[in-house]
Every structure is written in C-alpha cells, then in structure tokens.
Amino acid sequence: MRHSLECIQANQIFPRKQLIREDENLQVPFLELHGESTEYVGRAEDAIIALSNYRLHIKFKESLVNVPLQLIESVECRDIFQLHLTCKDCKVIRCQFPTFEQCQDWLKRLNNAIRPPGKIEDLFSFAYHAWCMEVYASEKEQHGDLCRPGEHVTSRFKNEVERMGFDMNNAWRISNINEKYKLCGSYPQELIVPAWITDKELESVAGFRSWKRIPAVIYRHQSNGAVIARCGQPEVSWWGWRNADDEHLVQSVAKACASDSQSSVGKVSTRNSCRGFPNAGDLSDVEFDASLSNASGTESLALQPQKLLILDARSYAAAVANRAKGGGCECPEYYPNCEVVFMGMANIHSIRRSFQSLRLLCTQMPDPGNWLSALESTKWLHHLSVLLKSALLVVHAVDRDQRPVLVHCSDGWDRTPQIVALAKLLLDPYYRTVEGFQVLVEMEWLDFGHKFADRCGHGENSDDLNERCPVFLQWLDCVHQLQRQFPCSFEFNEAFLVKLVQHTYSCLFGTFLCNNAKERGEKQTQERTCSVWSLLRAGNKAFKNLLYSSQSEAVLYPVCHVRNLMLWSAVYLPCPSPSTPTDDSCAPYPAPGTSPDEPPLSRLPKTRSFDNLTTTCDNMVPLASRRSSDPSLNEKWQEHGRSLELSSFAGSGEEVPAIDSLRRPSRLLGGAELSVAAGVAEGQMENILQEATKEESGVEEPTHREHTEVPEVKEEAPLAKESRTAAQGSGVLYQEPQLDDATLRSHLGPSLSSFSQGIPEHREVGHSVLSSSLPASLRGEDSQEVPVEQPQVENIAEDRENVVPAVPVDVKIGLGTSESSPLLPSQVPFETRGPHMNNSVHMLLEDKVKSESGPQLHHRPCLASSGRFSGKDMLPIAPEPRSAERPQWDSVLHRTSSPGNTLSLMMQAPCALPLDKCRQRIVCNGALETENKASEQPAGFDTLQKYPTPNGHCANGETGRSKDSLSHQLSATSYSSAHSCSRNLHHKWLNSHSGRPSTTNSPEQPSRSHLDDDGMPVYTDTIQQRLRQIESGHQQEVETLKKQVQELKSRLESQYLTSSLRFNGDFGDEVTSIPDSESNLDQNCLSRCSTEIFSEASWEQVDKQDTEMTRWLPDHLAAHCYACDSAFWLASRKHHCRNCGNVFCSSCCNQKVPVPSQQLFEPSRVCKSCYSSLHPTSSSIDLELDKPIAATSN
C-alpha cells in the first residue's frame, strides 16, 4: 500500500522546482526525462547553458555538452570568466561567461548540485522511478517489472550453480550462514563452500579474515572441476597469528575440487587423471563415497588434490606492510599444498593518481608533441597490463593446469573483483553474452560488496576524496581491450561498455547505488529505482555486436603487453560529439574499382549545406571526412522501411517542399522520401546495397551494355554535364535513393498484371519482363508451366540515346538556404546510381507505351496510383504531406531495370478518383486508410513527430507496415532497425501520457536528436553501422526472394483462374467491368485497390470480419509493437486495438473512434491503421505542408 501511495504522490514527494530564466526568450534546450525539472537556463559566451536536477546541458554553436550532475567531480573558476568542470570519466568541460558575476553564480549553482547527497533519496534515480510509476499508474496494466532486470539476474545464484555443474551431493554445499547479512554485511547471503565445512568453522574463519570476508567459491570450470574462490586478507599481524579452521578450509577447497571432478561420470579419463593429479596414480570412484559431508570422512581419503594457487594481488612488500595494520598474507608453512603468488598490483591511491594524470593529458592540446611519452608516464596502460596478466595467470591455472585458485587483496572488494571477474570473462563464453555479462557484474561486483558509493562519490555524505577511485572503470577498460583483441567473442559492442561507464556515475538507475547488497536492501533500491539492465537489455540491438559468433574461442588468451594495449578514446579523449545536426557527415565508401584517394569522375563530392556544390565539384575538393557527431548511417536504413508514396505530376509551377530546420525527413518530387541528415551520399548507399546484393544473392552479374555509354557522359563539357544532371534529376527526384534493385523488383506481380490487362498489345511483354526479372531458381527454367517470351531489350536500350536528350535541360531544383539540406538525388553520380536510378529513360519509355496503348484516362491519377509524366509536365502539381503523415508502401509505382538489363515497366492499376479523394492509404482488401490530420494529434506531438524512430516511423505513431497475409499484401516489408530502442522514447512517452506540454520550437531544439533514451549523448560506431547495413541488405534479399516466390505462386493461381473463366465465358465480363469500377467513387470499391481482381481469399476475409468478433492477442504473447516493431519495456507500453485486437505501443495506438463492428459505439482506442479506415476521409486542406523550396533555374 505504501508503494502505491508513493507512485500516486510522486509529484508531492519529488516536486518540480521553479524554472529560473536569465532571459525570458530562452527555452529548455532538451527533452526532460521522467521526474526531471530544469532549474536554471542562461546564456554563456556563445552558448546556452541549462541546469536540471539530473544534468548540465551546454549548447555551443558547433557542439553540445550533456553530462549528468553526478558525473561531475569538481567545478572551479579559472581566468575569472571561465568555469572548469572535471568529470569522473576523464572528461574536462570549459565554459566561458561574459561577466565575472555570472560565472560566480553558475559556480555556486553547480557546486550545490554536485555535492554528495545528504540522504540517498536526493539522487535523481528515485525521482525518475517515482515519476515513471506515476505515469504508469494511470494505465490498467502493471509495469513495475519493466524497471526490473530479467529473471537471469534476479535468479542468478541458483541458475549459476546449476549451469556450472557443482556437485552438491558430495563435494559442495550452499551455506546460509550469512542470511540477512548477520555474518558479513558485504557478502551475499548464500555462499558455496566445501560440503564438510560446518557453519561453526565458517564463523571461526570469519574472525580471522579481513572484514569477515571468508573464502567462498564463485566459479567452477565445467570440464575439469577446478574452481575460483575469493576472500579478504588473513589478519596475521606482527604477531603471526594463525587459524586452524582457516587453514582447513583453504585445503578443503582443493580436495573438494578433486572430489567434484572425479565423482562426475566420465569427466576424467585415466589419462586425464594422471595429468591433472600427477601424484594420485590411477584413481577409481570407489575411493569417493557419500561420507564426504563430515570432516572425518575426508581425512580417510587417499586422494592427493592439485596444489592450490593463492593469488595475492598486492606486492610482497605491501602485504608485509599490512601486517602493521593487522593484516598480512598466508604463510606457506601453515598452508601445505598451497602456492602463494604476489602480483604487485597498485592500490586505489596509485590508480587514482594515474587516472588524474591521464585526465590531465587527455585535456591538453589535440596533438601534443610528447603524447606517447606522456601517456606512458601516466602508467595507466601499465596498470591495465598488470591486471590482465593477473587474470591470465588465473586462467592458466584453472584451464591448463586444472588447479583451484584463491584470490584476495587487502580487503577483497577492489582488486579482487577485478581479477576474478576478468578471469571468468576469459574462461567462460557465457559471460561474454549480454545476459552473462549482467550476471557477472551483479555477482562479482554488487553481491560481493564493491564500494560503488565511496569509489564513485555518490554515497551519503561521501566527501572523502581518498576513497574515490575508478576501479570499475579500470575493469571496463580491460574488457574493452579484450573486445579489441577478440572482436567476434563478445555479444555486446563498445557502445554497451560506454553506456555502462556513464551510468556507473549518472545515478539515473539504482543498480550501482550504495556500497553493498545489505545497504541496497535497507534502502529498497530495487523497488524504488530502475535497473540499468532495463536499458542495456539483451534485446536492444543498439548494443549488439554483429561480429559476434557463439562458436568463437571458448577460452581467451589475450596478449597483455603494454604495446598491445590502446587508449580507450571513446571514453577518455575529448571529441566534438555530439555536435549539432548540421555538422553531420560521413565520408562515402569508395566505389568498387576506384581509388579512395581520387574522387570518381562526374561525382558530386559530399559538402556542407553552406558550400557551393557546383564549385566544389569543379574544383574536386576532397570529400568531407566523417565526424563523430555525424548522424548514424543506420538512420538511412531506419528510414528505409518507411512508407513511400508517389504524387501525381503535372505542371512545373508548384514549389517543392523544403527541409525544415529541425531535420525532418522531407518529401521531394513524387513523394520520394529523402533523409535530410546530410551525412551519406546516395552513391554510397548504392555501393552498400550493391555489395550486399553481390554477397548474398544468387543472381548473376548483370550485363554492362548500358554502362558502355558512361564514358561518353564523363567526356561531356561542364555545361552539358550540368544539363544532364538537371535532366536526370527531374526524373529521379521522386525515387528513394536507399532502395536497391532487389527491393524494387520485389514489387513485381499483381500490379503488372493489372496494367497489362489494360494494354492487350503489351501483355506478353509485361509478363515476360516479370519472369526475366526473377532469379532462375524462382522462374523454374526447367519447367514448361509458364511459357514466356523474352522482350526485345536491345531495341529498348538502343532508344536510350534518342530519349535522354529529349528531357528538358532548363529544369533546376533550388537547394534553398536550410543548413540541413541534403544532397538531392540529382546529385548522385551517374555511374553510381545503378540501373534503377536512370528514371528519365523509363519515364519517356512509359509515355511511348502509353501513346501506343489506346485511350488515356480522363481523371488525374491519385497519389496511391501510378504517377505518370508527360513530355512537358516534369514537376508535381500537388505539394507533399509532412513526414508525420506519410502513407504506407501500398500501391507504389516502381520503375527499374533488372540486373539482366531487362527494362521492367511496373504500373499499378490507375485510380480514377479526383486528387482530393486520393490522399488515402490502400490496403490489399480494399479498405482505405486515411491520413491522420494534424489537428487530431495529441498535445505535444507537433514537436515529437520531428524525431524519426529507428524503425522508420515518426514519434506520433505512424506505422510503416501492413500486417496482412503475404499473398494479399502489396506493401514492402519493413525491416527491424538496428536500434530497436527508439531515441528519446522516455521523453516522447512522458509528453504523450502525462499531458505535459513540450517545449516550444527554438533554435536549440536540433540538439535533441543527439540524445538517447537516457538523456545521454548517442554513441555511434561506424563499423557496427556498416555491419547493420550489410545485415539489412541480406535480410532484404531474403524477404525479396520470399515475396517473389509468393507473387509467382499468386500469378500462377491467377493465370489458372483466368483460363478457367475464359473457358466458362466469364472473362469478358470481368474485364469490361474494370472501367466502371475505376470510375466508381465509392470508398469501398475493391477493384481499384486490390491488384488481384480474381482473388477469392480477399472476399472471404472481409466476410469473416463482418460476422465475427475480434479476438484480442494475449498480452504475454506480444513482445513487440505490431506496427513499429519496437520492443515493449520501461518506456513503451502495451495497448490493444479495439478493432483488430493486436497489441501496439502508445504512439501507434493513441486514437479513439467508435467501432460499431465490435459493438463499441463510444470512442475507443484503436491503432492508426484502424483509425484511418474507421474515420472519415481527411481533406487535403487539413494537411500541413512543410516549408517549400522554390524550384529555380540556375
């Protein structure tokens, strides 16, 4: 009851503070998280600075700084007007102010904000969780489990004991002596010890070990039974104390290992027994009986176990010096059959000084002359090398020598977890998975009491700077070194580790609060805060390493020399990331067969929006290099799955919609969607798609007949070249540059059938084009069931030289002045567009076909139908809708040439509706889905819709896929994004559910696109982005082949039905009824919506929906949104559509409309698709248009 009260009264427990603006015109330059409230907004010198209860945000002209308050270690004023902020992750931030008084004001504010909390509830993680729960409390479902880690974390101890195969009958047992932490407050409640060691002996051992941290087993090698144990140092002191129970326990660990390995059936052969236990001889199972549960039974064993390795992380001098403080080390004389090794690792004070030296070095000038020598003098890489060598020594002992190992340092909570966690990571592939790594951190760092609060400085009144040390960061750096040496052995990527570094200090999540599990239990952090694993979950593709192979090395043996280690630049080195979106750029990959140093001819180089494209091209300025602040290449792929629609084309007097300053994906000619992120040249995407196609598809290499003309194009004069570029652009602008040939060919099928029926003299040609565009394996060349006739491709190709000059050359497209203007498709190099980019040829050829095919339509084709060009009408007459109002991929005109140089003319059945009746989505069964009107969107969505989600859908919930059966589906398959965790999803959810108005538009808003769900900068990895592109290309090829197979099957069925109708004399009636249906203005007319006019399944499906009530999909079966495919988690809730019964996220199911078919006559929640079909058609007047770009002539 108390917890529910906390959720309801979150705004009273954690109230928002009053916003203080230094300038009334200033706005908060970021989207706030749940429970976050901005307290101050002001102006620095050439920057906007904002301070909330979670972060400090400084937006400069060319970059921005976004850092959680708890990540800031100190703030000081330098040079009177400059604030100097030192961060705990090695970053240093400098901010200049115009006046001394203003600098002092912000110095006081920041010092008050970063001060260690007086009570733990002052940390932001508690307010964040409470406000999250308050938002969720308004819903009927329970969402508390989404803040929690997975079952693999909560049940980690039991699962690990079973997974590692401990013999709990004879060798080991689980002791509950530390239940409720009554023995040791920094140890877990359950401990694995030898089976014959009693709890009384453990209590005696606890009195002899530092902080009562007794030897406890934490890992077992599944093959040979050798274990790793950890503990604190023995309290020998100057008096040389000893403890018989402690000596017995240490020796019993080695004996239990031998017992465990021998008692496993077939675990150790005679040969392996002799190798593992050289003094044991041939041992039989008779020597092991069930009486091992008491000490007397073990004494009777005639077993000689392996020699136990005691690894002391300290140097021998430090261990002896600790005897003056009551500590010490094991004396070999008192511990027979044990070997003591000292590793000489530095203590926390030396590590802290080394890290401070590294931080000072990394904040110097970008290219110091003595960089390498200065880096060596910090000894940071040297400390990493020693740590790796220590872990590798444990791996050698356990894996190769089959010896048990006992690890300790002084207290056992700093260097000890570093060594044992790194050793387990090297030994066991499970810990190199996302789930296994979470378990590893929970068990070795959290359960065994690493003092995160003291080491990170966010504990209650933790003002002692001598207790602070980046111990966990140092260990993560070692994991990063392993990732570099073994790139295929880790399921998670570098972004995963970077996020973990940030949230070790950020206090957004409660995972790393307090010093041990006992304190976390007392503060109820698990119930009152969110877990960091809810963000770094296994299903989040943003943190997945695409190079990972589960069949990689079982045990890793890294090279530990300093010369083989590298500085972790993503964490330590300052970088301009994330900068403002206008700085985004990415150097294109060189085209196959070209030198990367020489730009290809006739190729417009990548430039900034303020550059002169023509001048830059003529001067051959080198291509801009990619900066870390530039947008992800994956964003191109994220937009690949979005809906695509073609507008009707008429006169050239209309203006072209522009790209606004907030970088929304704009719509250019013909409804083609172009990403406004000026980061990737279209030619680069073509190269990527072509490479993926060549690698994955079995299609033969295309003939290069049409490319023989390319040298002539390259030889043209500059004026002719410019004219050619403009001419090509006029016919290409409506085409999405990301689409490759395979994707466009996937839309062959019913559309061509419908078109060919209207043109009898070209019916055979169109049918053969389809067949020739399919792979040989799908055409079934050995089969004679579908006889086709190859078209005369040569004649069509020969006409190209005569057709291209006919395109008007005076048509130019103005780029406007927006900083975020992308490269237009007309600037794509001629030779890199691929066969399907030369649409001016296809356009004119279609006109030629039209002129030969009989009478023309009297009505203008609608947006969803085939948009045709005339010889004089090159620009669209109608402006395009906003990105938030894009229709699906249904009923799209595709023009392409197949890889075999076969020209494919693909046309949808034309729509006879007037233009104002055609702004609708067409689904396969004939239902028309209208566009959402801007006036019907909830408050706050005007801003949110400007940020596309990784799945290619806008934040307001516009879906980009249709989930109908494949045989009746025209829309292209939407592929899952590499970033399933949508950016700023927390913030969108807050604005859409809590009713809090979003911040107004301001020049500061573009910086939001660089902030992730957690309010932190987005980390991008170009290698992983390239791998995601290849993976998407592969998936695209697979889906294309599946679609082609299905469409071929549907075509065969249609052909069979056609022949049957001809035989019965009914075919003529079907054909003659087509013009009537095209002229029919009824929205339920099916013949213009479905390309399978003879399909009976679609009619059966409609009848079934009319007669049956919709059954809801159970909650537990839905892990992803049915529309945008985003995973359900902390910031994405489940909602049922009352019409179709599927489960959607809140953005995709936020409309309400009566559903009479389900007996719901009051407005009920429905998805976007159902809302469009149930709501009256929106007029084109309601569609808000983007800022137009004037079409000017140069």
UniProtKB/Swiss-Prot annotation:
GO terms for molecular function: molecular adaptor activity; phosphatidylinositol-3,5-bisphosphate 3-phosphatase activity; phosphatidylinositol-3-phosphate phosphatase activity; protein phosphatase binding; protein serine/threonine phosphatase activity; protein tyrosine phosphatase activity; protein tyrosine/serine/threonine phosphatase activity; zinc ion binding. PROSITE patterns: PPASE_MYOTUBULARIN (PS51339), TYR_PHOSPHATASE_1 (PS00383), ZF_FYVE (PS50178). It holds the Pfam family Myotub-related. One of its GO terms (cellular component) is cytosol. The active site is at 409 (phosphocysteine intermediate). It is a peripheral membrane protein. InterPro entries: MTMR3_PH-GRAM (IPR035888), MTMR3_PTP (IPR046352), Myotubularin (IPR030564), Myotubularin-like_Pase_dom (IPR010569), Prot-tyrosine_phosphatase-like (IPR029021), Tyr_Pase_AS (IPR016130), Tyr_Pase_cat (IPR003595), Znf_FYVE (IPR000306). Residues 151-572 form the Myotubularin phosphatase domain. It catalyses: a 1,2-diacyl-sn-glycero-3-phospho-(1D-myo-inositol-3,5-bisphosphate) + H2O = a 1,2-diacyl-sn-glycero-3-phospho-(1D-myo-inositol-5-phosphate) + phosphate; a 1,2-diacyl-sn-glycero-3-phospho-(1D-myo-inositol-3-phosphate) + H2O = a 1,2-diacyl-sn-glycero-3-phospho-(1D-myo-inositol) + phosphate; 1,2-dihexadecanoyl-sn-glycero-3-phospho-(1D-myo-inositol-3-phosphate) + H2O = 1,2-dihexadecanoyl-sn-glycero-3-phospho-(1D-myo-inositol) + phosphate; 1,2-dioctanoyl-sn-glycero-3-phospho-(1-D-myo-inositol-3-phosphate) + H2O = 1,2-dioctanoyl-sn-glycero-3-phospho-(1D-myo-inositol) + phosphate. It comes from the Eukaryota. Keywords: Coiled coil, Cytoplasm, Hydrolase, Lipid metabolism, Membrane, Metal-binding, Phosphoprotein, Zinc, Zinc-finger. It is found in: Cytoplasm, Cytosol; Membrane. The keyword Cytoplasm applies. This is Phosphatidylinositol-3,5-bisphosphate 3-phosphatase MTMR3.
